[in-house]
Amino acid sequence: NSIHDMDREKLFEKFLEDCKNRKEWCGQGNPNADILIIGQESTDISEEALIRNIMLCRDKKDRDAPRPIDPKNKTWANYQELLDEIYCRKSEYIDKWDFEKFAFTTELSSTPRKQRNYKEAKPSIKERIVFFKDSDFIQDFSVIILACGGYIKNDDKVREIDNTFHVEFCKEYGSKESKNRFWTHIDKKDPRKLVIHTRQFSNGISKDLIKEMASVIREHLRKLGLI
């Protein structure tokens, strides 16, 4: 059986068990969404936070519920803007983010930035990339946004994105001088999957990048009959 024929909830339960055993952040949002966003790192991954995170993911009623807006969290504000652009909508709430109904989010590093430097975290990031490569849950999304900058790369020597997500580079968007660029990748054998690599969605991301990326994703989802 193709993994696409399996129940996503079953794939998700296996992913949660694996994260629990590895003592890693699993993520949050709607595991049955069409869009997966992989950021750089979580802010709090104490043992208590990891346990709370898994409990929340198993709570089907609350796991993708609207969350109060945190003015300091620029990343989530930009995720909300992207999902609103993709689905041509606006949040139903003045004081809450509700993008998690439309996406699942997780992180490429399971060590908070404040506790280490990139060099120290690199081995665990590499292990997590292998974990994602082998995860049927991660691979099952129609759109995967790698919003984690240089934590994963494709260059002349290393084709981490291609190898991890079974895709090939397709097109570059944005100006070469700008930090606001993104790259698309597709699986030529199964064009159902679109992988986008870009910078972190924190401070400095442009409205133009969000709009252009949303347009590319919307067109992909339309082709698949998902919008």
Name the predicted role of every residue range.
Residues 41-45, 109-113, 149-154, 200-204:
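Short, solvent-exposed loop/turn segments at secondary-structure junctions
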Residues 133-150:
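Proline-aspartate-enriched helix->loop->beta-strand connector
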Residues 1-16, 120-133, 155-227:
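C-terminal capping/extension of enzyme domains
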Residues 37, 145, 195-197:
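Structural motif
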